[in-house]
Amino acid sequence: VEIFSLHAPGLSEYDVDRLPFSIKILLENLLRHEDGRKVTTADIVALAQWSLNPLAHGEAAGDAAKEISFSPERVLMQDLTGVPAVVDLAAMRDAIVELGGDASLINPLVPVELVTDHSVIVERSGSSESYEQNVAIEYQRNLERYELLRWAQNSYDRFRVVPPGMGICHQVNVEHLARVVFETDGVAYPDTVVGTDSHTTMINGLGVLGWGVGGIEAEAAMLGQPTSMLIPPVVGLKLVGATREGVTATDVVLTITELLRNHGVVSKFVEAYGEGVGALSLETRATIGNMSPEYGATCAIFPIDQVTLDYLEFTGRPQSQLELVEAYAKAQGLWHEPTAEEPIFSEYVELDLSTVVPSMAGPSRPQDRVDLPGVHRAFRAELGREPKDAIGVDAGASLRDGAVVVAAITSCTNTSNPSVLVAAGLVAQRAVERGLTTKPWVKTSLAPGSRVVMDYLDRAGLTQPLDQLGFYLVGYGCTTCIGNSGPLFDGISDSVIANDLSVTSVLSGNRNFEGRIHPDIKQNYLASPPLVVAYAIAGTVDIDLTIEPLGIDRDGVPVMLADLWPSDLEVAEAVRASVTPEMFTERYSAAFEGDKHWQAIDVAQGETFAWNAASTYVRRPPFLENLSPEPSIIEDILDARILAKLGNSVTTDHISPAGNIRGNVPAGEYLIDGGVTPVDFNSYGTRRGNHEVMMRGTFANVRLRNELAPGTEGGRTLKLPEDLEMSIYDAAMRYAIEETPLIIFGGKEYGSGSSRDWAAKGTKLLGVRAVIVES
């Protein structure tokens, strides 16, 4: 096997050995793709002497900031962002055929894996039938999208689809898809990935360099185009010591999120090193990598070591792959030796793991970590008044400010880690033994990121106690973490709105922005799975679980959290006895086959997609219609009108929302005209394959304020010169009839966020020729 050696004679004059591992991976990537055009010798030299660059010493780079072309080896997609990418590729095939070309020329040139995980919604919960009911609803709503994916699965080369119900893309990536090291045509090289989801960084825990990109960048990578990037600064995160008894991986990652947010790591790589690295399980490393977007880093990579190899073996990777990974990592200086000389980093941050304490984060930002005893104080500080009650929940029970109305064990961030899930099961088991139940207003759910989770919970005898507390399986997907929490229990929303209550959610997710989990929930707290169970029993966050009982047992004895919390040894022994390599091998042997619903989908044949003119989910986009072989000429913008004048921090979600569609907005009116009932509107995210919905949804976020229409929210503007107030979409269509070009003005931080492609496409479809902002 050949390699592009980082110790080649041409690099001997540079201190390559002390480069950060992440920079070494980038350097190998440039060496392998050098062509004198996209990647030049000057690019390679600039990266090889990274330690001499001002960036390496935490200084402003100035002219030293150099752009390079990085070529990822594969692309990972989820369905909300993946479906519009497939739509674009299908439209490219149509366009090339119309120009007299061969449709088969439009094919991915690198492996692409799309995991269908973002569409399942917790419509049903609290019963053994919840899972099947939610799956049936998911397929009924999303059949048109899934028909497209089935066609793509059969039509494209190097394109694989993991059907619904297998898990969350990042967890599936860590447990099965990631190679760590590739071998192709006798050449070995590092596995690198870009993904259409910001939490693609979870794979960093496995020593794989990767991060999230927009859909358009992912499409370019699929078609063999490199990703342009500035040579990054790298922050060294030195880990020392080991966690104390009772501290979970969630506590560690919330502490790191707070630490790195305060330090400042935006647009920087983070790389873990130090003797504490070896004390962390692979799953904990993956959890830390996963939350890179929350602390602002491009990625947060861990080096390859024996822990990596043990995990690869445990999850069913073949012995030959393990040997390749070890040999390659050691040959290229990518193997972590705690006693080796430290790499050179741009900046240094240190965390003593023994200082981490049980934590949560909230009420509205992942970096707002709170020690467990302080959660009730954080709630009251945000509330800003004395808590009040509202009567009328389940036979007279009292709903109060601080009530936990959603308690969700969810998200790839935590459900990839057997230790915290087993701990949750043990807490549930002890609670049931004491006769405790969850409060009647708490909507409980369990949505693992992998089918393996239910296998080992079953084997450990922990599924039943979780069920008894209402944590029934509701789906294998993102669910509550991305806002797919479904409706609250009957009467809860009405009571919350009528009494202006500040109710809460507790979830094992990664984001807790206001309004994200459910529009009627004002405060959201991130917590480990065992704490999710505890708060479901307590029913409120207005409590100090370290000194107050979370319930009274059947004998009238107060039950403290400490009475239910398992020891680290108990958790470790339960994990060791219940999680087996065979579970991973068996579950992933059919990763791409799908269930009976998937198999029953009628698969279209042919190299071009048969568009359904009646579809409200998938439409041929207009971007590639009537193309000419030559690029069009860019014309001057004359006699333009301002469509919107926006303020600061207008995110991609303000520009192109992903959430619910209301009936009284242009997108809702379009769907109603198409025969769709409001209950089946689904979300903007699931409608990203239909440009008609998406252009109507552009600038339609309910919280968007346009200074042209003061006093309004939700995508309103003034049509000029008539000064008529109307929706931004309706105004844009009137301007289009008048052939008037449009301009958007904005303040600072315009367009921050993820899912950038429709924020750009939708704006263009409205006839906007330029966006002028401060930053």
In which residue ranges do the predicted regions lie?
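Terminal amphipathic helices with adjacent charged low-complexity linkers/tails
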Residues: F70-S71, L76, A85-R145, E271-A272, ...
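Structured core elements
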Residues: E2, L76, V86, E113-V115, ...
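Active-site-proximal structural scaffolding
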Residues: P20, A85, N107, H170, ...
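Cytosolic catalytic domains that perform sulfur/thiol-centered chemistry
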Residues: V1, S359-A361, Q367, N484-S775
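Mobile "lid/hinge" segments at catalytic clefts and subdomain interfaces of large enzymes
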Residues: P163-G165, A178-E337, D352, V420-V422, ...
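Acidic/polar, glycine-rich intrinsically disordered N-terminal extensions of enzymes
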Residues: V1-S71, W598, Q605-G606, Y617
